[in-house]
Amino acid sequence: MRIIAGKHKGRKLYDFNGDKIRPTSDKAREALFAILYNVNGLSFLDLCCGTGAIGLEAESRGAIVTMVDLSKESVALTKKNANQISSQAEIICSDAIKFLKTTNKTFDIIFSDPPYEIDLGQEIINIVEQRNLLNKNGIIIYEKDKSVDYSTEKIIKTKEKKYGKNIFGFYMVKYE
């Protein structure tokens, strides 16, 4: 696992031993950031960050990053990876839903990749909508192992991309 582009391009990241965490593959991460294109200066939330690879990739490309995970092991590994590249990212040990319900921040990009067996998609989209956590023209990306649609009255799915076992659903606020 490595940083693909930006100021930390090529830097290797630590990974978990075993199969506790399912990090997004380098190939899927590269495809995701090709779609996002330019994240420089954008506020980026990585929910259920696991190893921190997505958030650190975003930071390497110039984003202002917040990473959240409930697992103390994940947070420790994310901090280890962040320290390796002198990251300025904010790393928080918290339940994703609790974080969304209590944060005072808003974001340009919210990336969420909870364990596939835990389906938080609808709840995350609902809270983001209710609390107006997405900045104008912001985007939510929800990673899953199957096609799902968590659209609401105000936040709609705009596209879906599949990379191997990874399916990214892209959501935006619907403006009248």
Locations of the language-model features?
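Class I S-adenosyl-L-methionine-dependent methyltransferase catalytic core
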Residues: 1-176
